[in-house]
Amino acid sequence: QAVQPVDFRHHHFSDMEIFLRRYANEYPSITRLYSVGKSVELRELYVMEISDNPGIHEAGEPEFKYIGNMHGNEVVGRELLLNLIEYLCKNFGTDPEVTDLVQSTRIHIMPSMNPDGYEKSQEGDRGGTVGRNNSNNYDLNRNFPDQFFQVTDPPQPETLAVMSWLKTYPFVLSANLHGGSLVVNYPFDDDEQGIAIYSKSPDDAVFQQLALSYSKENKKMYQGSPCKDLYPTEYFPHGITNGAQWYNVPGGMQDWNYLNTNCFEVTIELGCVKYPKAEELPKYWEQNRRSLLQFIKQVHRGIWGFVLDATDGRGILNATISVADINHPVTTYKDGDYWRLLVQGTYKVTASARGYDPVTKTVEVDSKGGVQVNFTLSRT
């Protein structure tokens, strides 16, 4: 029987810092606490890495991240991520599911991307905006470079810190935790006209599967009519939605991930109330515990492997993996390792690198898990 978290309360910055340091100190063999930068008011943007080899990228092991509290008054994600840290630490080595997850995945958890906004927000805020923005009063989820619109707000320190973090690690999968509705929102988040229509990414099928992997473990979310009292007409079949079809978000973080890194990110709305009372928090953990774990497991779906040099057998960095008919190549990391999320099907996959002859393989992906596909390239 897995041990459940007990620390259910709202953690202000100093409490969160104490919590993170405590778990980093108590579980040094599976944790590493680091910061990716500072907020406007110079609070650390902490990340807890949970892995069986903290601080090290293991060749072939995918990297995963959760980001919470990007909007400072949307606090459920922040607390769930602290619960998740506690849960993973306390169950590693005893619970087989947690042990397997931590041994096979390098997990990075950022409980708060907007610690300044959080300090301004108020417990009991249902649908307000106080504390949503950062200290310079900019919305961080409208602050990333956008494919369709020129973002005119100056780039914020929190945004820049996260962008450089995303360029530092080979993240494969991510979720950005928000509040104010109950749905998993997937790319694209906007479209050329800036109107509410379905804006399909090349990996629409993958994103739908990822979104469903979360929503179907959350009974209330999966039912699809989340906030009857606040938004009576809102209906999301199976608790998922294309971002732009719901409403336009130019400058959002999830699309930037997909368009500028190898990482697939979705945005998860965890509940209709943005800052619920502390006594509600155990209920949110209960509703989302399975979803949070199932979503991490999705990082192992699709294909993964190595692109190697035929002469010396070394990994080739920055080789390109492209899948026929899906316009979204991914690149290899320093050991020549790559991960490409895909749904069930048959694919033609090509590995190419500068100065080498490309190699194409036909690959069968089943519904269960990941298939290892290695490529050996010869110099031209």
From Swiss-Prot:
Record field: catalytic activity: Releases C-terminal Arg and Lys from polypeptides
Assigned EC number: 3.4.17.22
Protein family according to the UniProt entry: Belongs to the peptidase M14 family.
Residues bound to Zn(2+): H71, E74, H178
Gene name of the encoded protein: CPD
Molecular function GO labels: metallocarboxypeptidase activity; zinc ion binding
Residues covered by the Peptidase M14 domain: 9-299
Presence of keyword Metal-binding: yes
PANTHER family, per database record: CARBOXYPEPTIDASE D (PTHR11532:SF73), PROTEASE M14 CARBOXYPEPTIDASE (PTHR11532)
Transmembrane segments: none
Pfam families found in the cross-reference section: CarboxypepD_reg, Peptidase_M14
Residues modified by glycosylation: N133, N318, N374
Identification of the protein by name: Carboxypeptidase D
Enzyme class: hydrolase
Region Disordered, residue ranges: 112-137
GO biological process: peptide metabolic process; protein processing; proteolysis
